[in-house]
UniProtKB/Swiss-Prot annotation:
The keyword Transmembrane helix applies. The keyword Iron-sulfur does not apply. Belongs to the major facilitator superfamily. Sodium/anion cotransporter (TC 2.A.1.14) family. It is found in: Plastid, Chloroplast membrane. This is Probable anion transporter 2, chloroplastic. The chain crosses the membrane at residues 125-145, 160-180, 191-211, 215-235, 254-274, 279-299, 343-363, 381-401, 413-433, 443-463, 483-503, 504-524. GO terms for cellular component: chloroplast membrane; plastid. It is a multi-pass membrane protein. PANTHER family: FI19708P1-RELATED, SOLUTE CARRIER FAMILY 17. Residues 1-95 form a transit peptide. Keywords: Chloroplast, Ion transport, Membrane, Plastid, Transit peptide, Transmembrane, Transmembrane helix, Transport. Probable anion transporter.
Amino acid sequence: MASIRSCVSVNPAAAVTPVKYKSARVGAAGLDPKGLRISCSSSSSSLAAGGGDGCRDAGCASSSGRGSGVVGSVGDGWWGRRGGQRERAVAAMCSAGMEGVRHGAAAVASVPAASASALPERAKVVALVAAVMLLCNADRVVMSVAVVPFAAQYGWSSSFLGIVQSSFLWGYVFSSMVGGALADRYGGKKVMAGAAALWSLATFLTPWAASQSTIMLLAIRALFGLAEGVAFPTMSTFLPKWFPTHERATAVGISMGGFHLGNVISFLATPIIMSHIGLAGTFAFFASLGYLWLSVWLFNVESDPLDSRTISKSELQLILAGRSASKIQGSKFPSLREILSKIEMWAIIVANVVNNWGYFVLLSWMPVYFKTVYNVNLKQAAWFSAIPWAVMALSGYVAGASADFLIKSGFSVALVRKIMQSIGFIGPGVSLLCLRFAQTPSVAAVLMTIALSLSSFSQAGYFCNVQDIAPKYAGSLHGLTNGIGTVAAIVSTIGTGYFVQWLGSFQAFLTLTAVLYFSATVFYNTYATGDLIFD
């Protein structure tokens, strides 16, 4: 690898005072082009602004590997005056790999501190992302609960219930593929806002559509899935812009914790709300929560921290220093043929397929499993089904925090992703095999809880791995893999029913799912990488 040498010189100001900037991006960087000189020995190009030899003044530091530099530019908002004195502050970071970047950030020259709130801006961001993911899943579960009174009111057959439930995935499988590309192009803020507005509208219209015709109901449910399919790839694009590499798994864990918590809240709250305000009122209530979130999101979040007017300079520098090397200006999105030619990409695809396969088997059939195998009533089945999802919401955060701790401790990104993914697949596989020995619903609930809790470690495995190998195209590639995974979810959900009908038992299909978990673990550990593949 080429050696990269960075030289920084600083012309100190007579006095350092806060500065107001016309450009949010420039102001956040807080850099003065005059007096800055950066040169890299691995490149024939150099950046120089103003006089003075930076190398003589500041000395040089070198390292090896892939390097990246972060320097403020453009705009005339560089200057501030107080008492006739001019301040100059220069910050330059040039490194080779993530550790080099972080060390470079620690050596940044003094930058005037902007007033900032006590709560980091990225904490607000991840809280809002977790909130919208909670609503995303909660709105799905509303229909799963409401479908029972709907069926009683309109005389739906069991087969039609299956069609209604699957109609959500018809739109989902399409938008999950294109949603990431939209987020990459237009920014996560706009795309997530549009998606939440649309799925909240579809939620509100569902009772009305059911009263009109079956075609109208299926169309509204497909529209609902179309809007929700954007959420995951948009999150995959949005979070890497706001969090350095060593914090991303934690951010994903918190966001996914919100997603799984939405399952629990809606499962338990929907029957209560429905008993007070009816079917239409329940859907309207959850839709209103979406628009309430939207009003907060639009005025408090930007797609990129460089566009934020409230972020502190120190936090911005931390984020920029911890970003993966960005793509060369002017490079094009890789073709589908190029994407599918990379075995590292197939490792992520296979992991996504198997994860979705197992996830939707448990999501769709767990209440039926408890009722059929252990002959419990529907209320008991709902509680036994809710417990695993509640624990999963917490375990996802533990998985993310553990992964980030290992990366900060010096373990390679590839090794950490493989460890997390192994836990996320081997744990559920063993738990599903043990279900054949469960004699009581309580023991089965414990095994289901273990399976789902450990499966959440996949969030710090293959899910974050997309951001490692293609940070610039994370949304698009996650959309592609998630779209393929959604097809697997449709197959597994329908396949479970046929297996139970033919064999009279859930265990055969659960055993097949366990075998897929184990096989995917071997494939992922063999071919996955933490290196940049698409830049």
